[in-house]
Amino acid sequence: MKQIFITAFILFVSVISFAQNKQADAAKAVLKQYKDAVEKLDVTGTEKLFTADSKIFESGGSEGNYAHYLEHHLGPEFKDFKSFKYNDYKVEVTVDGNYAFATETYSYVIVVAKDNAEVKRKGVSTSVLKKVNGEWKIMVSHNSSRK
């Protein structure tokens, strides 16, 4: 009887762990979609990756929700870029129920279209994702960088 209990417990823990990993991978996929769009300098359709009431913070400032950030920050900024490339990208995600907490670390290089100047930075982003109708969406994103 003791052996059956131990086996059942181990199986239960394994199933829980697998489910957590699957959810973490799904949240990571959302972050990857956003990262890939930024690298392409084409964020068309990325609104679907964010909650309507999302909050975006960048380098100490509040950028409003994602729609506002896209219209007043990313959109205009991308017009000045020739390229944007992430390097050394790492992401860690912890899932707790309908919320996922992510930390991304990376370096990036931006090439400015006007004069081909390179801007090199190290960055970190923290995000809170929320499961909405079965899909992970970015609810809060905070990123900062340094030379």
Task: Please describe what each predicted stretch is.
Residues 109-113, 147:
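Sequence/structural signature of outer-membrane beta-barrel proteins
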Residues 4-13:
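Sec-dependent N-terminal signal peptides
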Residues 122-147:
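Short beta-strand edge/turn micro-motifs at domain boundaries
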Residues 43-95, 105, 117:
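A solvent-exposed, acidic/Ser-Thr-rich amphipathic alpha-helical stretch
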Residues 114-120:
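A short acidic/glycine-rich loop-to-helix N-cap element
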Residues 14-52:
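Short, low-complexity N-terminal intrinsically disordered segments enriched in polar/charged residues
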Residues 98-108:
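A short hydrophobic beta-strand element
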